[in-house]
Amino acid sequence: MSVSLSAASHLLCSSTRVSLSPAVTSSSSSPVVALSSSTSPHSLGSVASSSLFPHSSFVLQKKHPINGTSTRMISPKCAASDAAQLISAKEDIKVLLRTKFCHPILVRLGWHDAGTYNKNIEEWPLRGGANGSLRFEAELKHAANAGLLNALKLIQPLKDKYPNISYADLFQLASATAIEEAGGPDIPMKYGRVDVVAPEQCPEEGRLPDAGPPSPADHLRDVFYRMGLDDKEIVALSGAHTLGRARPDRSGWGKPETKYTKTGPGEAGGQSWTVKWLKFDNSYFKDIKEKRDDDLLVLPTDAALFEDPSFKNYAEKYAEDVAAFFKDYAEAHAKLSNLGAKFDPPEGIVIENVPEKFVAAKYSTGKKELSDSMKKKIRAEYEAIGGSPDKPLPTNYFLNIIIAIGVLVLLSTLFGGNNNSDFSGF
């Protein structure tokens, strides 16, 4: 039996809706395409993507309506990722963050996939970067990636659910969403990254930074300059250490546990850089500068940010100005996420109209004021029943005041109240 590739391509790239399901994977780097003569050419059952095939292809699975035998074939694909699936996956990632408190390890997953980029190598995928290669065991075994198998286990169910998202996009989507949901800035992301298809395409070990090299500042520049990043971007990206912990069994750095990490909703242990180590802010720079607590981690590469004159200019600025840090971090994170990537379509895919983000946790900062939008809403509801600040309800002036105060207190508690719940991580 033969099936027209052009016809299948037309079906995929038209407005016809096709159901999606994950393809069967194999350790082999060469795809095996099975054809069954008993399969009806009109019984297209599902479309699936697989790490066996380049992301310029779909795997078409055709199921017989009676005996269930299937046919697989390769057909052209329209883009590396599907925008609708990206939007849905982002919402699922928020739920994952809410339940697993895995912000740091997802940030690290995206970083380490992109951070192998070498600007001096033009050819893709030899240049490294954000290409999904970190899903292969060969790269997961690199010393710098210790522990990231846990991140892949969290991501794989999402990949199974959303087969029309590349691994490279899913890693970067998870990383950016984790920053945003921890209270950080919105990252101006684009998607459409093409995946590598075989472990032979993984970069060699040694492209990621070390925590304690002999000359920390020089080492940071060697690694990040190779990626095409500058001093400002090095310092801004280092600020992401406000999230997470170091574990001696993975990196060789940090204490087994501290007073900040011995308990929590997730796996305990490790040493954090900050007290509230799952809240994204500029605490990292403040804590390094002050060195006020032995239970907070300061690596040699962290200390270098306040020792090297060029780095220090930015570190001092970020310690004092969280808005400046957020702005520079968002730009640097977006740039990092694109390093080395091959986009399909070439201009990338921008997600728009994403639902309002879920704030994963709030830390107590004292009394909070109602937002202007909430105040307007309360006033509109009050005026709807005949009252206003200038013209109170005629029935009972003092009763109206008591009711208004009660409503304000209730809404303040519900929407702006203190919540001392903490994050945990991996």
Curated annotation (Swiss-Prot):
Binds one cation per subunit; probably K(+), but might also be Ca(2+). One of its GO terms (molecular function) is L-ascorbate peroxidase activity. Belongs to the peroxidase family. Ascorbate peroxidase subfamily. Its main location: plastid. InterPro entries: Ccp1-like, Haem_peroxidase, Haem_peroxidase_sf, Peroxidase_I, Peroxidases_heam-ligand_BS. It comes from Arabidopsis thaliana (Mouse-ear cress). Disulfide bonds: none annotated. This is L-ascorbate peroxidase T, chloroplastic. The active site is at 112 (proton acceptor). It catalyses: L-ascorbate + H2O2 = L-dehydroascorbate + 2 H2O. Heme b binds at residue 241. K(+) binds at residues 242, 274, 281. The keyword Transit peptide applies. Its EC number is 1.11.1.11. Residues 245-269 are annotated as: Disordered. The record marks 108 as: Transition state stabilizer.
